[in-house]
Amino acid sequence: MYYPFVRKALFQLDPERAHEFTFQQLRRITGTPLEALVRQKVPTKPVTCMGLTFKNPLGLAAGLDKDGECIDALGAMGFGSLEIGTVTPRPQPGNDKPRLFRLVDAEGLINRMGFNNLGVDNLVENVKKAHFDGILGINIGKNKDTPVENGKDDYLICMEKVYAYAGYIAINISSPNTPGLRTLQYGDALDDLLTAIKNKQNDLQAIHHKYVPVAVKIAPDLCEEELIQVADSLLRHNIDGVIATNTTLDRSLVQGMKNCQQTGGLSGRPLQLKSTEIIRRLSQELKGQLPIIGVGGIDSVIAAREKIAAGATLVQIYSGFIFKGPPLIKEIVTHI
């Protein structure tokens, strides 16, 4: 496969520049016959999760296609689902550059992007043009300048705008790069948010005559007590699924490596065991009452199987996709 050569060229560039260049090319081919250049035939292995039928258990994690610009091209590579976003009510530039760093030896990434996106209205227009035949998840967040105490308003605005177009909606309360965001994972703040989201979901179901499931994306840095509390809240509020996990602030496995001290969330192989352990504990707490979408450091068939053995129904990739390319999709779907 050509990807090792492509990767070598891309890794000569600054990580964000490499991402922009890649997306520039994908935008050119998305929705055109040139999509055949990236199309891969993968086996159909249907999985039911959150009341939806996924054509295979592998999805693209949020953060790669923040604005839904390359849905068809990414879909052609064989993903059973794509999670686009994180998107916010209003466009925002994100944090200052540089804000994305490779840890090449560890096959990890550190990012402090800060929800850079062109806003929810732009994303919806892109979704309307797409023809992806898999499940499309839309990941939503709050604007940086929205006070945390008003954060739920941003989630409700986004829900209202994406509901008609989403296969499922992911609630991102676990990015480490928006000040105060992770506080929404705890106690009364989480209960208030989930109550508002569930009420909005019920209202939107009545308006649109369809039920769009909602999943909450959590951090890997929860202590035991916090994990138990989160699991309890998700069950009490009848949330449809949980995505575990986002990036970590823990640097214990990358000490001494180039870029290891950069501020931001660490993803990729160094996150693998930590996220799998969270999935295992979460699975014990949830007792099969709520499905888990497993994400964090999946870079091989074995790593994907470990997530499923720990309790995940579906899995997602991001950093592994950057390091291994489209062949990883075919490999995982074929052998999982």
UniProtKB/Swiss-Prot annotation:
Q: Which reaction does it catalyse?
A: (S)-dihydroorotate + a quinone = orotate + a quinol
> So which domain of life are we looking at?
Bacteria
User: CDD domains, alphabetically?
Assistant: DHOD_2_like (cd04738)
Alphabetical keyword list: Cell membrane, Flavoprotein, FMN, Membrane, Oxidoreductase, Pyrimidine biosynthesis
Which residues of the sequence carry a binding annotation for FMN? A62, G63, L64, D65, K66, T86, N139, N172, K217, T245, G268, G297, Y318, S319
Q: Extract the PROSITE patterns matched here.
A: DHODEHASE_1, DHODEHASE_2
Where does it localize? Cell membrane
Record has Flavoprotein as a keyword: yes
Q: Does the keyword Cell division apply?
A: no
Entry binding sites for substrate:
K66, N111, R112, M113, G114, F115, N172, N177, N246, T247
State the needed cofactors, names only: FMN
Give the family from UniProt.
Belongs to the dihydroorotate dehydrogenase family. Type 2 subfamily.
Q: What does this protein do?
A: Catalyzes the conversion of dihydroorotate to orotate with quinone as electron acceptor.
Q: Which HAMAP family match?
A: DHO_dh_type2 (MF_00225)
UniProt name for this protein: Dihydroorotate dehydrogenase (quinone)
From which organism does this entry originate?
Answer: Salmonella typhimurium (strain LT2 / SGSC1412 / ATCC 700720)
Q: Which gene encodes it?
A: pyrD
